[in-house]
């Protein structure tokens, strides 16, 4: 089981990656960090958010405090950047 942090996960490519990961690696935990700008839409993750292994944080990867807090609280094993 891995803990993944997916930045930009509410966009087209990021959300498809999340669905793929949940389907093929169901034991993994995923946290999506996305600022939900023009390219991201939380509704793309509606199905994924129903799963207990999926979490979401609204935030910008350029915000140092947000990123540090996510790393401190979630402690990911892998970071996948689509932001």
Feature-to-residue mapping (PLM):
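N-terminal Rossmann-like NAD(P)+-binding domain of SDR-like oxidoreductases, especially those catalyzing
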Residues: 1-83
């Amino acid at each position: 089981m891995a803990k993944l942090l997916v930045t930009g996960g509410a966009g087209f490519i990021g959300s498809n990656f999340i669905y793929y990961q949940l389907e093929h690696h169901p034991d993994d935990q995923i946290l999506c960090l996305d600022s939900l700008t023009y390219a991201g839409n939380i509704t793309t993750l509606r199905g994924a958010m129903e799963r207990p292994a999926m979490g979401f944080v609204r935030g910008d990867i350029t915000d140092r405090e947000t990123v540090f807090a996510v790393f401190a609280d979630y402690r990911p094993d892998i970071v996948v950047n689509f932001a």
